Structures are given as structure tokens and as C-alpha cells.
Amino acid sequence: YCVYVRQANGCAQADNNEPERFWPNDLGPVTKDSLTTTDADRAVSELADYADKLLLVRGTRFGFPGNGCGHSGGGNQCLTAAKVSDTPSGNESLAMGESVDNRIALELNPAANPDPLTLYSGRMAGYINEVLSYRGPKDLRAADRNPWSVYTKIIGITDLPEEVIMKIKARRTSVNDLVREQMQALMSKPDLSGADKNRLQIHFDAIRDIEVELLCELPPADEIAAMEAQQGYDGADALIQTITKMQMNLIAFAFACDYTRVATLQIGDGNDGTQYTIDGVTLPRYHQISHRIFSDGDMGDPIPDAQGKHHVIDREHGKLFKHLLDRLSMYGTDVGTLLDDSVAIWCNDLGAGVSHTYKNIPWVCAGSCGGFLKTGQYVDAGDVTHNKFHNTILSAMGLTNPQGEYVDDFGDPELGPGVIAAMIA
């Protein structure tokens, strides 16, 4: 299984004379001790509990320039390693190839569900909305930011009468209750294997847990109203962490039930302008923080300690990513946990916000994909184009090239082929 979780606006790494605040101090082994001592001031230290399962990859770059908008061009290339369209251009530019999640879904997904799970959390301001998942050239896949909608698709109740769905919502009736007779008949079949029974039980047990989270009460109305008044719209910023965690829970659930083999989660829109509230403090708009000024352009008053605030947001994304790792670790398999059988990837569509660089794109991987990836390591890919990163992930997922060897041809054909050997166990 594979999931890409995308953060916007680059990370607070060394750039334009700013200090390093994202990566560990030294290449090589990553341990819980190092992340809680010498590297405790770095954003990746939020993942210290999973140090032995981490693979941190620096030294990759996008292969092509943007076309009038750094954010759009970065989003176009992030999961596609494809060129950016000539037309449309600017903030409307599109990728000229399929995305890695699309390739995985076509090769590995169950026949009943050929599409990747494409999720979203946060605002859609309209300037640049979805950026990640492509069926092919200029064919951008829409993302779902409604956890209830995603949930009903996963458990297959989208065709239920509206009154039944409303009953589930209003009365918190369990879906298990609605199909209990069918469940009992299925579980009692003599030809059902033990593994199938275990998978079904995981499915049934997880339903109630997710229902409780999906149907929980929102924060008090006065708190939401205060955020709405400050932000000027409907409270999406105040809920972004909550919705992100719900979507992550659904990704883990979908993997555990083999609903899909691959998912993407885009947090925030193309130039994420969320005002994050962290530890009770509401920060300026994230996009402006990444520019270091109170502006979405190149002129404005400086934001005090802007890189420090960017670092705080990086840490928040690290905490959210850890939540996903926690959820994937909840599900046991024959050889360990669902995380061990997967690779979860925290990524970005820029290297650093202040320069909008397409160099040194951060990839934070967790899970070895069944032992393929070399974990507990921080490696430098050597300034290669990031198609080689995706080739390595595709190979970890069991895909091959036409000769039966590691995938080496993902992305635009102008890019050099190959994998990143340092990532492979």
C-alpha cells in the first residue's frame, strides 16, 4: 500500500541564507535518540517514535520549469514527473502525464475500484485547487474533502435510500446494524478462510470507530464563529487538522479492507493560504509566511520570525503525518503492521517557500513496503530528478518495467531513467 500526503509552500530548510530547520544534522542512520537529542530542533523530530521505520530522502529536483506560476508548476510535477502544459498556463497549468498513484491503481487496485483514493482537506480558494492526481495529460482528478462522502463510498452505501443515510447520520445507527443478517450469513460460510474472516472482522470493527469520529460534534459554535469572523469565510481553517485526521483514518481503513492500494491526501490548496491555529495561536496565512511577508506577491511588510512560523507549521504537518502512522500501525498483519506492509510519504510541491525552488524536494517516507525500502536512514539522492524517487516507490510496490526489472521509466521520457539505489534495502 502507498499513500502520499502533500504539504504546500515548501519547508523551512536551508535556503536563501536561512538556517536548516527541517532535516536532521547528519546523513546516515536515523534513531529515536538522535531525533530527540541532536535533531530535536528539526521538524522531522516529530516522528521520533517511528525513527526505525523512516527513510528521509533529500537531493531530488523537479525536471522542468513552471509556466507562469511556481505553485501550479510544482503541483503539476509533484506526483507526475511530467512537463507543465504550455496551454493552459499560469495558475491554471496542468501536468502532461499521469501521476504515480494512477499508475499504482491501474496495476494493483481491485477490479471493482480501479481509481486511487483521492482526498483533500482544507480550503479551496479557487486560484489553484487540486494539484496531485492525474489520469493522464491535462486530466486532473478531483479530490473529495468530505469524510462522510468518502466513508460511504468505502463501505458501499452510496446507493442506499437517502432516508437510510439520514438515519445513520441523525440517529447514529451503525451500518453494521443495517446489514447484520447479511454479515452473520457471510461470516458463517464454511468456505470462508480464516484470513477472510479476520479481514471482514477488521472491516466491521472499524466501521463503528470511524462513524463515531465522523459524527462527532463540531467545536462550540462561538469558537467557530470567532474563527469565521477572523478569516472571513466558513471555518474551514479552524477544522483543517480535524478533517485531515479523519481523512487519514479513512485511508488506513481503506487499506486494511483492501478497498484500494494507493491514496493521496492534499492538505490545503495550491498555494495554501490557511491560517493555522497551533497551540492556541492563530498564525498569519501560510502562503504569506512562506513568502516571509504579509503579501502573496513579492512586496509587503515582513512577518516577524516568518521562518520560525514556517517551522511551526512544518512541525504541525509532522504531527499530522504521525497520526497517519499511528493509524496504519493499529492494523496487524501476518508479518507486523499495516505500516510495515506500506509506504507512507510526506511530500511537498516546492523545496522551500521563500525561493519557490524546485530543488531539494523533501520526501519523508515511513514503512518499508514489506522490506523493500531501507528504513532508519537519511539519504541524499545526489541532485537527481524526482522521477527516480517515484520509480523506486513503484518498484517497492511490486511493479516492474517490461523486462521484469525495477521500474525505470515513470514520468517524462526526457528524464534520465533509474531508481535511487540508496533507498533500497
Name each model-derived stretch.
Residues Y1-A425:
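Ligand-binding pockets and gating/stacking loops
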